[in-house]
Amino acid sequence: VVFDDVYIEGITKISAKDIRYAKEMGSAIKLLGVARNTDTGIEAYVCPMLIPNDHPLATVNDSYNAVFVHGDAVEDAMFFGRGAGELPTASAVVGDIFDIVRNIKANCCGRIGCTCYKELPVKKMEDTYNRYFLRLHVEDRCGVLAEMTEVFAKYHVSGAQILQRDSQRQDDHLEEVV
């Protein structure tokens, strides 16, 4: 995978309100790096994702990182540990120094990589299927919800939940979360 083909989006667009709504929907928002081999190409992206609270990745917080792997033989496996802070950073630096020393002693530049390489297309982010939520500012009138569902149906968008809060009322509008 060429790095430029990987879709990357940070967390700067995520608000405290987004986090509250995700929590109300039984989910957490996590910044994930995803690599998935599909029949139509490789999915490779880094972006905030909505994760159900019962998924092991939803419990990864603070300076901890995790790698979640799903494979034919292992099914689901998660590797979990500190990924930031004084000791993990020092450990990574020491590991890099050992690699450099090994390379100097062996008179080579790096280890032998995978020799089973196969070029596959990387899918565009808009061609992947994921869970999202939309926060819509809509008029407070009869029929708005029906109009929203009509538009979703037209574009084959399936909604799992709809949240409507009177406390989010602004002028003659409501905030709907789908």
Where do the protein language model's features map onto the residues?
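Substrate-binding/catalytic subdomain of NAD(P)-dependent oxidoreductase enzymes
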Residues: V1-T59, Y64-A66
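Short acidic (Asp/Glu) and glycine-rich catalytic loops that position anionic groups and cofactors
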Residues: V1-V2, H70-A77, D127-Y129
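A conserved regulatory-domain signal marking ACT and ACT-like small-molecule sensing domains
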Residues: A92, I97-V178
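Glycine-rich phosphate/pyrophosphate-binding beta-alpha loops
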Residues: E75-A77, G81-L87
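A generic structural motif
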Residues: V34-R36, H70-D72, H137
